[in-house]
Amino acid sequence: LHAAGVAAVPVHPLSAVARDDDAAVSLPTAAVGGLRAEGFVPVFHGDVIAHAGEGVTVLSGDELVTGLAERLDAARVGLCSTVPGVLDSEGDVIDSITDFESVAAALGDSDSTDVSGGMAGKVEELLALARPARIFGPDAVGAFLAGDAPGTLIDGGSAD
């Protein structure tokens, strides 16, 4: 990001985020807002975080994206993945997804499924978000940032 001229700064969830005993996540929205107001781009990643009564638990990057999008009223939401979008069983990018059941079979195991559920976890998390979002690959980051609509649209019922 720095090489592309983006004033990116890391925000490490272990140092700034926690779950309460009901598993609700507190996010550093004031700090994020301050960084953004000064022209910085906060960059988060999945991490372990303190969880009241549990020690630590995993906070996925997907959960961070949706939590911050909701709390900061994001105008656009995008997740960059290792593939150019959500792929169907033939390996083609699915244009849009509005419900999980219609794509569940294609979202079985992936080559990079992790503790957050891989692509299926991303789709489920974004379907629960009350706004449209996109999943795209690394080659489409510039297009997404320029306002284009690469990859797969995920929309679980927003008003848009």
Task: Outline where the language-model segments fall.
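C-terminal catalytic "cap/lid" subdomain
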Residues: L1-D160
